[in-house]
Swiss-Prot record:
It comes from the Bacteria. This is LexA repressor. It comes from Corynebacterium glutamicum (strain R). The gene is lexA. One of its GO terms (biological process) is DNA repair. Residues 107-120 have a biased composition (Low complexity). Belongs to the peptidase S24 family. The keyword Transmembrane helix does not apply. The active site is at residues 177, 214. Represses a number of genes involved in the response to DNA damage (SOS response), including recA and lexA. In the presence of single-stranded DNA, RecA interacts with LexA causing an autocatalytic cleavage which disrupts the DNA-binding part of LexA, leading to derepression of the SOS regulon and eventually DNA repair.
Length: 253
């Protein structure tokens, strides 16, 4: 077993536990449950095949875990046992440090696929550093505004050469007010957080607690958020809070 209780009288805090390691200093594979082994395989195979880790939901689906909190608990346990290393600043940045000696069928397939794949793209160390893990924070209205959901739902790995750098987040567009600008309902907009905008930039803005995406416009009559659909009227924006600048639009075909 990986976890051993200290005998009575041992030094340390009450209830403290020690993770068993092998003589060579590596974590003991015998400490892993079948589910934890499966989680390691899923993470490893995703990194090998596509160059970045799976999402919390993908791990849960593969390991038979219904809630994201259960997945988070298992990841913490694997980190404690020394099989994973996680970056606290990048929730999806997970590094499998030690693997059990036995290979699953899926991991063998992944290794074979890696050997046949061209050594470029996500496997290039320089390009690998250009991936941004962008949080999805809900839906944004483009038309009749709806309240934006401010909880992070997911993290998407996106090429930094497309979305750039900075504090980024993603929102899904709902409505047709930006149709003539090519931003359609169901599209995803990547937004760089910033409190100001330049003339003509597309922005995500909060108005009376509701969020919308529009073109920023300022003239002698005031500040406006302009739609790109003649059936919608400009919105006065003197009291609007600029959430950020839209830097990319993504669409599923």
């Amino acid at each position: 077993m990986a976890i051993e209780k200290k005998p009575a009288g041992a030094r340390g805090s009450r209830g403290s536990r020690t993770v068993k390691t092998l003589p060579n200093g590596k974590p003991d594979p015998a400490s892993l449950s079948d589910r934890q082994r499966r989680i390691l395989e899923v993470i490893r195979d995703a990194v090998v095949l596509r160059g970045y880790p799976p999402s919390i939901r993908e791990i849960g689906d593969a390991a038979g875990l219904q809630s994201t909190s259960s997945v988070a608990y298992q990841l913490k346990e694997l980190e404690k046992k020394g099989f994973l290393r996680r970056d606290p600043n990048k929730p999806r940045a997970v590094d499998v440090r030690h693997l059990p000696e036995t290979e699953s069928r899926s991991s063998k397939a992944a290794t074979q696929a890696k050997s046949k794949a061209p050594q470029a793209g996500a496997h290039d160390p320089e390009l690998a550093g250009q991936t941004s893990f962008v949080p999805v924070v809900g839906k944004i209205a483009a038309g009749s505004p709806i309240t934006a959901e401010q909880n992070i739902e997911e993290y998407y790995p996106l090429p930094a050469e497309i979305v750039g750098d900075g504090d980024l987040f993603m929102l899904q567009v709902v409505g047709e007010s930006m149709r003539d600008a090519g931003i359609l309902t169901g599209d995803w907009v990547v937004v760089r957080s910033q409190p100001v905008a330049e003339q003509g930039e597309f922005v995500a803005a909060m108005i009376d607690g509701e969020a919308t995406v529009k073109e920023f416009h300022k003239d002698s009559s005031g500040i406006w958020l302009l739609p790109h659909n003649d059936t919608f009227a400009p919105i006065p924006a003197e009291n609007a809070e600029i959430m950020g600048k839209v830097v990319s639009v993504m669409r599923k075909l």
